[in-house]
Amino acid sequence: VKHVIIGTAGHVDHGKTLLIKALTGIDTDRLAEEKKRGITIELGFAHLDWPDGTQAGIVDVPGHERFIKNMLAGAGGVDLAMLIVAADEGFMPQTVEHLNILTLLGIRDGLIVITKKDMVDAEWLEMVQEEVRERAKGSFLEGKPILAVSAYTGDGIAELKQALYTLVHAAAEKSVRVPFRLPVDRVFSVDGFGTVVTGTLIEGCINEGDAAELVPSGSETRIRNLQVHGSTVHTAYAGQRVAVNLAGLKKTDVQRGDAVARPGSVRISRMLDVKLTNLRDSGRVITNDMQVHLYHGAAVMLAKVVLLDRDALEPGESAYAQLRMAEPIAAKNGDRFVIRFYSPLETIGGGVILDDAPVRHKRNVPAVIEALRIKEGGSAGDRVEQTLVELKTALPVAAQLAAKLGMEAEQLAAELGGLLGAGRIVEPLPGRYIASSALDEVAASCKTLLAGYHAKNPLHAGMKAAELRQKLFRAMEQTIADALLSELCREGVIRRAGERYALAEFEVRYTKRQNAIRDKLLKYYRGAGIEPITVEEVVASFPQNERADFKQVMDSVLSAGELVMLSPEICYHKEAYARACGAAKAHFAENETITLAQMRDSLGTSRKYALAILEYFDKTGITKKEGDFRRLNRGFPPAQA
C-alpha cells in the first residue's frame, strides 16, 4: 500500500479548509479562534479515501503570513502539493511565498486548484486560469493540471478527486527499510494515556512497543500506542500521518520541532553543510555571516550563514554554505530547509542538507567545495568514498556509514563491493572500511616516521610497535591501529620484525668490525644457554676500543629479537628464551600456577635465572604475580607458543 501526504498551500481565505471538507467531509479547523476568524492558524489534518481502498493524508496549512512557521511545520512531510488560488482574487503575496516554500522543500509534483468558481463569470475564470498558468512557469507546477471548483456547489470536486487519485498512484514509494523518523508538529495530553505527538512519518516504519529516542534532547521513550487517521494500528509506515502515545515523557518534555526516531539513528549537531538557494524574487542579497531564521521540519531556530566560496549570494543564485546554530538540531543528509530574513520575517531562500554533522570549515578552501560537490551530485559510490575520506582512520562499520549517508543497507553493500573491487577503498578488518586515499596518508606519515627512526638508529631492526602506534595514531583503539599497520605490511609499505616495524626496503648494515662483534656476541650467548654470565662481564670481555661499537651492536641484536634482555644483568639468546617459555608453558598445561621453585626445577637452573625469567614474564604481561606464585595473564605470544 502506498502512503502519500497531500499538502494545501495558498493565500489566506482562498478556501483551502472548505475545499478539504468538500473532498473529505472533514473540517480541519480545530481551534475556536479559527472558527471565529474563518482562517486556519494551526495545522489541520484529514484523509481522502477512494472506493478501491486508496487513501491519502491531507495537511491543511495556514495561509496568513503571520502563520508561515505553522505552514512550514506541516509542509515538511508533503509529497504532493495542492496550490489553492481563489477565482475572485488570483495570485496573492502568500500564494507566491507558499509556492516558493514548496519548491525549496523539494516537492516536485502536484496541481493547482482555482476555488470559488461560482463567484465569477466564465470570462473572468478564464483570465484567472491564464494568470495562474503564467505564474506557475519556472516552478514544479509548470504544466501541471489546473482545475476550477466550487466547494459550495460541489462543481469540479469529483474531477479534482480523480486527478488527485492519479497523482497519488504516480507518487514515488517512500523507504520503509531505514530507521524511522517522525518530526513532531503537535504535542498534547490525553487523559488516561499521557503525552501524544503527531507528525508525518517521513521515513521507516514504526511499531507499537518500539524503543524510541526524542531528538535533539536524547530522552528515551517507548511507543505505547499508534493511530493513523483516527484508527489504532500496530505499525505505521513512511508517508502516513501518525499520532504516537509516548511512554515515560511529560507534555513539557516534548516541543514542536523535536523528532521521534530510532535510538542512535539521528546525529545531533550545531552546524550543517548545505546547498543554499536565494529565491529569484527574494529582493535580498544573502551576505556572509548573515543571521537568519532556519526552518527544518517543524523546528525553528536562529542560524548564521557562512558562505564557503563567496561573500554574497544574489537573488536567483545558489552556493555552498555552512549554517551555524546556537542550539542543537536533529537533521539528516538530504533533508530540505527554508530560511527567512531575520527582520522583517520573509522567506528568502532554502535548500538541501549535504552534511548533517560537519566539522567547522574555513572559507574558500577548494577541497571543501569539491567534497560538497560530490555530496550534492556525485554517484552513490562517490558519496560513500567521500564519506570514508572524511572519516579518515575511524574504520566505520556498514551500519554507521548507512546512517551517515541515509542509504539503505542493500544499496550500501553493493556500493562497498564495487569500491573494494575498484581499489578505491580497503577493508583492514572484516566489515570495517577506509578510503584508499586515507590509507595512503597513513602510509606517508608512517614512512616519514620510520625513515627518521632508521636515520637515528641505523642498527635497530625497527621501531617498537607500541611506539609507532602512539606516534602515528595517538589514542586510537589498538585493534584498529594494528589492522592499519597490517594493511601497510600487506601493501609492501612496511614490514614487521618481531615486535618492531621497519620500512620494507630497510636493512641493517654493519661495518666489518660491528659484524665481527655481532658474530662473537651471538656465538657466546647461544653457547651459554640458560646460565650466561652477567651483561657487565660480557661487556668487559671486549677490548676498550670496541666498546662504543659493542653498545650499538647490542642494541641492534636486541631490537631484532636475536637476544632478549631479561634484566639489566641477564640476557638470553632467543633460543634459550624459547626453551624457558616452553618449560613454563608445559607446566601451565597441567597447573594453574607456578612458583619460583617450580620454574627453577623445570629448567634445571639456579634460583637467580628462574627469578629473572619469571619477572620478565610479569613485565611483559605473560604472567601475573599473586603472593608467592604466578598465574597466566595474557599468555605466551605465538612466537613462544
Regions found by a protein language model. Give the residues of each.
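C-terminal effector modules of nucleic-acid-centric enzymes and ribosome-associated factors
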Residues: 120-124, 134, 249-565, 573-622, ...
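Residue-level recognition of beta-strand microenvironments
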Residues: 11, 187, 204, 226, ...
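Small-residue-enriched segments and motifs
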Residues: 6, 43, 56, 144, ...
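Residue-level signature of catalytic and energy-coupling elements of molecular machines
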Residues: 13, 19, 38, 60, ...
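Conserved nucleotide-binding/hydrolysis micro-motifs of P-loop NTPases
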Residues: 64-65, 88-92, 107, 116-121, ...
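Conserved catalytic-core segments of large NTP-driven translation/proteostasis enzymes
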Residues: 117, 123, 134-282
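Conserved Switch II/interswitch segment of TRAFAC-class P-loop GTPases
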Residues: 54-55, 61-66, 76-127
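Conserved G1/Walker A P-loop phosphate-binding module
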Residues: 1-61, 65
